[in-house]
Curated annotation (Swiss-Prot):
Species of the source: Oceanobacillus iheyensis (strain DSM 14371 / CIP 107618 / JCM 11309 / KCTC 3954 / HTE831)
Keywords recorded for this protein, A-Z: Hydrolase
Record protein name field: UPF0173 metal-dependent hydrolase OB2186
InterPro entries in the record: Metallo-B-lactamas, RibonucZ/Hydroxyglut_hydro, UPF0173, UPF0173_UPF0282_UlaG_hydrolase
Xref: SUPFAM superfamilies: Metallo-hydrolase/oxidoreductase (SSF56281)
Amino acid sequence: MKVSYHGHSVVQVETETHKIVIDPFINGNDACDLNASTLETDVILLTHAHNDHVGDTFEIAKNNDAFIVAPNELANYLSAQGLNAHPMHIGGSRKFDFGTVKLTQAFHGSSYVAEDGSVIYGGMPAGILLTIDGKTIYHVGDTALFTDLKMYGEMHDIDIAFIPIGDNFTMGPEDAVYAADWINANISVPVHYNTFPVIEQDAKAWANQIKTGKGYAMNIGEVIDL
């Protein structure tokens, strides 16, 4: 299984049978090396409804007839727009043909600004625990620090965790060090930073502070084999 990072919170997972993208914010994400028009994927996972996470979901899903998994209210909205979306809620898990998804708690907001300017309620934000062939990826989503992250680390043997460090909209670097320690993943990767001036951070400096497992600031487009 190959896992790659593409700026902001965009993560791709590729197995022998499936191509999965999480929070595909491509256009408007200057760090991203992907092209929404040509991206090939059959599964899209969304942590919440903010535009910098839903991103190019509509274009990608329509081009690929992709299957979407998202928090309940967001999934219902996407389904109403003609997309193939499966709703889940916090604490729920489900086994799909591509792997098992469990939604975890996240402390954040969730709304989508449509093209006409209307604001769509997106339900509760989430983190995503994705387990495939015995390997577990934890995309923490956008969140503040909260102590249940330690519980998730105790309950699950996490191979790689993607943790926001940008501050202002999510936890900052100091809190994210605590999060990495509690989650206790083999590899902790910083995300949600340097996309906008207000979330500029030194990812390598953050990674060097991680004492539990390995902190690692992935380069854009870099691939890790799990």
